[in-house]
Amino acid sequence: MSFLFESTSNNPLTRFRRSFSRTLMLTNFIINQSAQKNLSTSLREKLSQMLMLATLAVSQTVFSIEVLDDEGSLVKLDESAQRIISLAPSLTELLYAAGAGDKLVGVVEYSDHPEAAKALPIIGRYDMLDMEKILQLQPDLVVAWQTGNPRASVNRLRELGLTVYIAEPKRLESIPSHIRRLATLAGTEKLAEKVIEEFETKLITLTENYRTKTPVRTFYQVWDRPLISAGGNELINDIIELCGGVNIFADIELLAPKVSVESVLIRNPQAIIASGMDIERPEWLDEWLKWEQLSAVNTSSLFFVPPELLQRHTPRALIGAKSMCEQLDQTRAKLVSN
């Protein structure tokens, strides 16, 4: 743990360390006193050896919590985190899902779900963190966004002595694992298990209902200028496949590749699903209507799913997935009728 912050925990391991430290201090005092009172050299040597061995033992820190993060780093805590800062809106949601919401002391802008998150102190944007504010909040754990937070900022947090755990679910089925690991760090495992069970049950149901249906070529549009889609390594690709769709840009490894209108026309999606950056259907989605040769235009399959239900890798992704699956079902019905 960082020397910056003094723990007031009643954790048994912490109490043991404090007791051990007091014992070391007492032993050292006895040695000093024995020297002043001219006690035998052999006795002083034995006491010195005891002090050396005890010091060596206490220096071998034993951590009660050890969890691997998404970069393979072993994050160690000597007790469950009590003051957590989240560096991404999606991570804030995951922490609440893990039952650790009441341990959050700071979040970044746009951390708006659940409602309680809106009342938490803001420590900047995900890409522009206020280091001074973070230090003032004295976190014992900072949860960082692997591909979103600037690497220099994450490194700086570590240099300042903070414990940083890096996370980002990249697959739909990995969300339960992320929730479970965060719960382990926060000591909220029992609260998290109910959320995990509900998620896994819903995921199985959606998979059974949609994955084996007639494939629908699908173009997922994140933004219009530049034209951005989702590649094969993005969690959104998992959702498209879950719904029985085929991501027309699944062959691109980038998470959010820039694509051209020409490439979309060539791949001729049967459905276009947009999210944009707001809760309202983006006006630019209708710009595809001028391309009458598109199958998606012929079947009126220009759909919208709110971005927070797909672009945040949290349990709510299944709400967005259900909406997408129902939309692709509409396209299937229209293709059959045509």
Language model: regions and residue ranges:
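His/Asp/Glu-enriched short active-site or ligand-binding loop at hydrolase and phosphoryl-transfer sites
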Residues: V108, N233-A256, G276, F303-F304
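A short, structured surface patch at a secondary-structure boundary
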Residues: R83-L137, L141-T147, I248
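Extracytoplasmic substrate-binding proteins
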Residues: I65-V67, S73-L74, D140-L141, R151-I228, ...
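Short helix-initiation/N-cap motifs at beta->coil->alpha
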Residues: L68-G72, I123-E132, I252-V261
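Short helices/loops that flank or line small-molecule/ion binding pockets
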Residues: M131-Q138, L160, V259-N268
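Bacterial N-terminal signal peptides that target proteins for export
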Residues: L13-F16, F20-T23, T27-L51
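Short secondary-structure boundary segments
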Residues: A88, Q146-T147, V222, I252, ...
